[in-house]
């Protein structure tokens, strides 16, 4: 059984499909639209994690949590367009910031943004499940509810004592957070 919010989608789908055909739009535009979505959302079908961009309030909250002295490493799992990383890097010169993004277009935007800001960020295109979390002092995740339990298992196995796992918005099932901001 489907969730109730699918009902309006089913009701409007056919009329919209017929209206679109009546507009006689070139199929090239549909290809461009599809490829754009593919570049933006990448492997969402596999990861179950769409593109979420961190807000300014998250930037402000993270600035209070990160160490003010002593070098530290920070990784953003699913770093999107790199806004969070560049903002944090501009405030915390003592940090080395890493971003891992699986969608091609946000990763490219992040790399270009990083080149323009000349910050201490290192952006990688790939799957964060393939990275070793023991290399980082702070692991930040703004993913979705789907991978949180697996993320916790990976973090528990790989992260060093004293390192910090920060989850934005989505709870880890069965785990009480040490602190909520």
Mark where each language-model region is:
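Membrane-helix interface "capping/anchor" motifs
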Residues: 1-9
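Membrane-proximal soluble helical/coiled-coil segments
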Residues: 44-158, 164
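Conserved beta-strand signature within the Rossmann-like core of class I S-adenosyl-L-methionine
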Residues: 162-171
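Active-site capping/gating segments
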Residues: 171-181
């Amino acid at each position: 059984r489907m969730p109730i919010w699918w009902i309006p989608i089913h009701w409007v789908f056919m009329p919209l499909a017929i209206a679109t055909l009546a507009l006689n739009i070139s199929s090239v535009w549909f290809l461009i639209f599809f490829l754009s979505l593919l570049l933006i959302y990448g492997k969402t079908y596999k990861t179950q994690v769409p593109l979420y961009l961190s807000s300014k309030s998250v930037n402000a909250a993270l600035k209070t949590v990160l160490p003010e002295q002593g070098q530290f490493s920070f990784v953003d799992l699913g770093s999107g367009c790199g806004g969070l990383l560049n903002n944090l890097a501009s405030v915390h010169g003592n940090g080395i910031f890493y971003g891992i993004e699986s969608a091609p277009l946000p990763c490219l935007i992040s790399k270009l943004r990083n080149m323009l800001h000349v910050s201490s960020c290192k952006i990688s295109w790939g799957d964060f499940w393939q990275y070793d979390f023991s290399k980082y002092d702070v692991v930040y995740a703004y993913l979705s509810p789907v991978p949180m339990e697996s993320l916790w298992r990976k973090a528990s196995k790989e992260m060093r004592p004293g390192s910090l796992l920060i989850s934005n918005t989505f709870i880890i099932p069965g785990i009480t957070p040490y602190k909520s901001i």
